[in-house]
């Protein structure tokens, strides 16, 4: 078949050129080192260590045993909750607390600029000690974020729905983008043995936005919920590969951030009017956390 070029007007001047398409896998790297199957008796036993955040309520929800609770190295934790409930505030507090202990933290923000994150950090912690261990990277490019996340003791991605890569079509928050971004961070955590926290949005129904595979890919799923009237916040665990899911953490939101409430029964009893005629106290048991009311 003869073809005429619309530019020069000549016939049969077209040349067929094969264009190589770049194929990118959702699983960017294989973080495993296994070459062949091993017998269970030959597998080396590794004692599970944990990194304490200094926040007893938060550490207890993450789990542990023998008095050692906190973050498992190489674990990936998804923290979700309603908008404005305090997800970013809680993780920034954890990051600042770890910085005080000499840990190097990377906070990747896809929703705020570096200066906005600094304003929140100064409100939560007025001191200067340890601030040089906290690094802020404002970007929505997941590939850049992973490339920069080297040599840190903890990585926070806020939020996973804002992360995007040029390797995949779709807008931020779409299924291919969320799946790819999560797989990059999971590989980072497993290969470098660095814990990663992801902030996740929720839908109007109160479930994590995005594909259900997001919850399956991570090790721990935490949900932070709050009351509309009071500043009480409750942290629950709905999935935990390294601990129990029955624990809850109770916090109070004030101008200094989220303050742990260690004695929930005493706190809620003190808030009630003890002189109210006909007032009745009762005990309840929810998700293995006893309290009185």
List the predicted regions and their residue ranges.
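Cys/His-rich short segments
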Residues: 1-24
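The Walker A/P-loop phosphate-binding site
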Residues: 26-127, 143-147
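P-loop NTPase motor core
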Residues: 72, 77-78, 89-90, 137-232
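Conserved P-loop NTPase/AAA+ ATPase motor core
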Residues: 75, 248-249, 255-293
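Conserved AAA+ ATPase core "coupling" helix
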Residues: 120-121, 219, 226-239, 246-249, ...
């Amino acid at each position: 078949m003869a073809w005429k070029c619309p530019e020069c007007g000549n016939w049969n001047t077209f040349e067929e050129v094969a264009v190589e398409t770049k194929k990118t896998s959702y699983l960017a790297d294989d973080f495993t080192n296994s070459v062949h199957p091993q017998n269970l008796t030959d597998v080396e036993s590794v004692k599970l260590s944990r990194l304490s955040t200094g926040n007893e309520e938060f550490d207890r929800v993450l789990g542990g045993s023998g008095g050692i609770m906190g973050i498992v190295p190489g674990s990936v934790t998804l923290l979700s909750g309603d908008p404005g409930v305090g997800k970013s505030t809680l993780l920034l507090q954890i990051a600042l607390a770890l910085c005080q202990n000499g840990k190097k933290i990377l906070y990747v923000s896809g929703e705020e600029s570096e200066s906005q994150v600094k304003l929140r950090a100064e409100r939560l912690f007025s001191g200067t000690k340890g601030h040089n261990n906290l690094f802020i990277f404002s970007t929505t490019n997941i590939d850049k974020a992973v490339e920069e996340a080297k040599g840190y003791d903890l990585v926070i991605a806020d939020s996973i729905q804002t992360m995007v890569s040029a390797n995949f079509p779709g807008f931020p928050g779409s299924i291919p983008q969320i799946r790819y971004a999560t797989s990059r961070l999971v590989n980072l955590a497993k290969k470098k043995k660095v814990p990663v926290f992801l902030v996740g949005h929720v839908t109007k129904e109160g479930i994590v936005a995005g594909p259900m595979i997001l919850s399956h890919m991570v090790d721990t799923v935490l949900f932070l919920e709050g009351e509309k009237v009071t500043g009480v916040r409750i942290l629950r665990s709905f999935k935990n590969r390294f601990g129990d899911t029955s624990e809850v953490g109770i916090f109070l939101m004030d101008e200094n951030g989220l303050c742990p409430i260690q004695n929930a029964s005493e706190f809620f009893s003190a808030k009630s009017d003890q002189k109210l005629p006909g007032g009745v106290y009762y005990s309840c048991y929810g998700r293995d956390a006893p309290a009185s009311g």
